[in-house]
Regions:
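Hydrophobic alpha-helical membrane context
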Residues: 14-15, 97
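Boundary at the C-terminal end of the N-terminal hydrophobic targeting segment
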Residues: 15-22
């Protein structure tokens, strides 16, 4: 009986996850496309191209833009989570207008501060450096279950990145990050990632 209850609970939680992880809005922000869940008020993933990213534009006076159906600034206040960029602001720091586009809640999910400022940031810098050698197609997203902050905003259990060399089509990185204080990062496969996110992404474009 106990085993049956555990299985039933597991199925219920998995069903909740499937319901949550559904894209109901696709938003084109010029430099990236956000595949957004209005239920979770976060992007499930974004995709963008990057070539020779980086620059010296200051982000000092840039503010996050609140838009229809998105999270608000107050939702993150005292939440214990950073407003983590999926598309790194520094990737487009060669142009102020383009960098400003990354400060949208269509490009933000809650990230543990140690991850956002640690291994996540380090990998952003590494990938940006690689963009000076090859044009890249980049996908960035989260894997969600039931964790929330204020206003029922979904918190990813894991964050992920997929990086493809656009010129050759070669898969360069499939990375999974634990969204906690361990900031653990490890490589995985596209097949394994696809099973975890429960919705289809066409990575080969």
């Amino acid at each position: 009986m106990k085993k049956y209850i555990v299985l039933l609970l597991s199925f219920f939680l998995f069903s909740l996850q499937l319901v949550s992880q559904s894209i109901d809005k696709i938003v084109n922000k010029n430099i990236y496309i956000s595949y957004y869940s209005s239920k979770l008020k976060v992007p499930l993933y974004v995709e963008y191209d990057l070539f020779r990213g980086g620059g010296s534009v200051s982000r000092k006076n840039m503010r996050f833009i609140e838009e229809e159906t998105t999270a608000k600034n107050k939702d993150y206040a005292k939440s214990g989570f950073d407003r983590g960029h999926l598309v790194s602001a520094e990737d487009f720091a060669f142009d102020k207008q383009l960098e400003t586009l990354t400060f949208s809640y269509y490009n933000v999910f809650p990230q543990h501060p140690k991850l956002n400022r640690g291994s996540w940031k380090a990998w952003e810098a590494k990938i940006r450096e690689e963009s000076h050698r090859y044009p890249l197609k980049i996908f960035v997203g989260g894997i969600y279950s039931t964790k929330k902050i204020k206003n029922k905003i979904g918190v990813p259990d894991y964050c992920w990145k997929v990086v493809i060399n656009k010129k050759t089509g070669k898969l360069m990185h499939v990375l999974l990050f634990k969204n906690d204080e361990t900031q653990a990062a490890f490589r995985t496969t596209l097949d394994d990632l696809q099973k975890k996110i429960n919705y289809k992404i066409n990575f080969k474009r």
